Amino acid sequence: MIKVALKDGSIKEFENAISVMDVAKSISEGLARNVVAASVNGEVVGLDHIIDTDCDLNLFKFEDKEGKEVFRHTSAHILAQAIKRLYPEAKLAIGPSIENGFYYDIDLDHRLVPEDLEKIEAEMKKIAKEDLKIERFELPRNEALELMKEQGEDYKVELISDLPESEIISFYKQGDFTDLCRGPHLPSTKKVKAVKLQSVAGAYWRGDENNKMLQRIYGTSFEKNKDLEEYLHLLEEAKKRDHRKLGKELGLFMIPEEGPGFPMFLPKGMELKNELLKFWREIHRKAGYIEIESPIILNRKLWETSGHWYHYKENMYTVKIDDEDYAIKPMNCPGGLIYYNSQLHSYRDFPMRVAELGRVHRHELSGALQGLMRVRAFTQDDSHIFMLPEQIKDEIKGVANLIDGIYKTFGFEYNLELSTRPENSMGSDEEWEAAENGLREALEELGLPYTINEGDGAFYGPKIDFHLKDCLGRTWQCGTIQLDMQLPRQFDNTYIGQDGEKHRPVMIHRVAFGSIERFIGILIEHYAGKFPVWLSPTQVKILPISDKFMDYANEVKKELFDKGIRVELDDRAEKIGFKIREAQLEKVPYMLIVGEKEVADNNVSVRSRDKGEIGSIKLDEFIASISKEIESRESIIQD
C-alpha cells in the first residue's frame, strides 16, 4: 500500500501508483476541479505526477502562492505559443512567472505596440478555448540541442549548451508548440481564460547590457474574469497613489539626477519625516530605550569582525583613508556593538535597549531603484537589545508589542513570517536551533499566527518579519526582529554575571519602520497623500477672501503657529474658489476662510479636506479641536 499524508494530517492509502489528480478526485470532485498543482515531499509538481511511494502531499488551488506560480508559468507558455502563431519568425528566450503575473522575452524585429498586444492576447484566449493538453517529455542533452536547432530557437540552444552533458532536458508540449522548461504546468490550457497583456519593455538577454536587447511582454492571469477586473482596478488605483507622482505633486521629495538612488527631502517632506522621527523617539523613550549615533564610515577590521566584509561586501561602498580600507556602513549593528564594548557591564544592566536612527548606504543596481521604495541611502530605525538568556522571551514579546502599537497608529494590519537559517550563515546548528525556537515560542505565547519562510534569515540569526497590509491590500515587509547569538561572540561582548565570571549576552536586532524613506513611500500610497492631521506637512491653510482681510489672516496664522500647528497663509490675489481648489489639491486637512463676517465675529470659517464645509466657529474652539486631533494621532483612511 502507498500511504499519502495530506496537509490536514489525514492519510490516504492506495494499492497502486496514482497520479496527483486522481488523489484529488479520491477526496472530492470539487477539489479536483479547483486544484492546479501540488507538492510531493516539498517539491512542486504537476497534476500528472505519479506517486509510487509513501509521501507528504499538499494540493494547491489558484489562491495558493504555488498555485499562482504554476498557473502563470503556463500562461507564459500560452503567450509564447500565441507569439509563434502570429510571428513565426520570433525567437523565444525565457518566460517565467513573477509576482502578480508573468513575462516572456522574445527576439523579434517588429517593434510591438499596444495594438499588437491586443492581437496576441486574443490569440492566447483562443488557445485557452482549444483546451490543448500539456504534456511533459524528456530528452538527452544532445537530442534536446538538435530539437531546438531544428526549430531555430537560438536562445534555447544557448541555455541547453550551458547544462552538463549528462543532463536530461525536459520540455512541455501543447498542441503543435513545444518549449524548453523545467515545469511544472497545468494539465491543459483551458483554465487560463482571464488574461491581460499589460506592457512591453526592453530587456537585455540574460540581463547583460553587452547582449542583444529583447522585447519583454508582461502579463497577468487569473482563473476568473471578475478577479482579473478587480486586480486591474487595483492597479489603476495604485497608479493614482504612486508615491513618486504624489511626492512630486505635494512637494515632498525628489531624486536628483546628480544622485540616483539618493533621495532629497524638500521642506514639506522634512516636516513629515521629522514628525515620524518625533513619534518614534517618543515611543522608544517610553519603552526604556536609549539613543546613540554611530559613525557612518568605519574601517575594514570592524567589518571583518562583524562578518559583513565576507558576507555583504558586494552591497557596500568602500573607500581608502590614509591607505587603509574603510566602508560606509550598510547596517547600524556594528555601531551598537562598539557602544556596548565602550564600557563594562553587569548582569544588572540588562535588558539594555540601544536605539539608533542611523544613516546607511547600500549599493543597489540602477535598474532596481524605485523612488523611495528602493534607494541607495536611507535612515534605518535600528535598535539592539542586549540581555540575559532568560530574558529573551519577554524582550521579544516587548518588541512585538511595541511594533504592534506603532503600526496600529497608522491603521495598518500585518502578518508575521518566521525566517529560518540561510545557506550562507554563521554559527552552529545548536545555536541556530536555540535562536529559532526562542522566536517561535515567543510568538506562540503571544498567540500571534505566523508562517515559516525557510532559509530567508539573516546570515547571523533567524528573524521575524512584519508584513504590513495597506488600504489596497498590498503587503510591505517593514518591521523585523532578529535574535543574534553570533555577533556578541564576534565582538567579544561580555558582562559580569552573579557568579563574578564573564558571560556572553544575547542580542536582538530590530526595526519597526525599517527604512524611514521606504516607510514614507508606503504612507504616501496608503493615505493617497491625504495624511492624517498629525502627519500632514501643512495642517492648516488660511485663505483670506481679499487683501483687506490680510491683517486678520496674519493674526490667525500667528495664533496657530504659536500653538505649534503647521500653518500656511495663501496671500495671493486670487479668487477664493481658486484658493480652495488649490488647497484641496495640496491635500491640506483644514482650510480657514476669513472674510468680513469672520473679522467682525472674530471667527474662522472652517472647511475640511475630508468632510467639506464645517461652518463658522471661534478660533479658540478650532485650535482646541485640531490640537486634540493632533495629540491623539488619529489616522483615519479617507477614500
UniProtKB/Swiss-Prot annotation:
Molecular function in Gene Ontology: ATP binding; catalytic activity, acting on a protein; metal ion binding; threonine-tRNA ligase activity; transferase activity; tRNA binding
A GO CC term assigned to this protein in UniProt: cytoplasm
One of the GO biological process terms: threonyl-tRNA aminoacylation
Coiled coil ranges: none
Region (Catalytic): 242-532
Major localisation: cytoplasm
UniProt entry keywords in alphabetical sequence: Aminoacyl-tRNA synthetase, ATP-binding, Cytoplasm, Ligase, Metal-binding, Nucleotide-binding, Protein biosynthesis, RNA-binding, tRNA-binding, Zinc
Catalytic activity: tRNA(Thr) + L-threonine + ATP = L-threonyl-tRNA(Thr) + AMP + diphosphate + H(+)
Domain spans labelled TGS: 1-61
Localization in the cell: Cytoplasm
EC number of this enzyme: 6.1.1.3
Co-factor: note: Binds 1 zinc ion per subunit.
InterPro entries: aa-tRNA-synt_IIb (IPR002314), aa-tRNA-synth_II (IPR006195), aa-tRNA-synth_II/BPL/LPL (IPR045864), Anticodon-bd (IPR004154), Anticodon-bd_dom_sf (IPR036621), Beta-grasp_dom_sf (IPR012675), TGS (IPR004095), TGS-like (IPR012676)
Segments passing through the bilayer: none
Cofactor: Zn(2+)
Binding site for Zn(2+): 333, 384, 509
Family: Belongs to the class-II aminoacyl-tRNA synthetase family.
Purpose: Catalyzes the attachment of threonine to tRNA(Thr) in a two-step reaction: L-threonine is first activated by ATP to form Thr-AMP and then transferred to the acceptor end of tRNA(Thr). Also edits incorrectly charged L-seryl-tRNA(Thr).
Subunit structure as annotated in this protein's UniProt entry: Homodimer.
Protein name per its UniProtKB record: Threonine--tRNA ligase
Organism, scientific name: Clostridioides difficile (strain 630) (Peptoclostridium difficile)
Organism classification: Bacteria, Bacillati, Bacillota, Clostridia, Peptostreptococcales
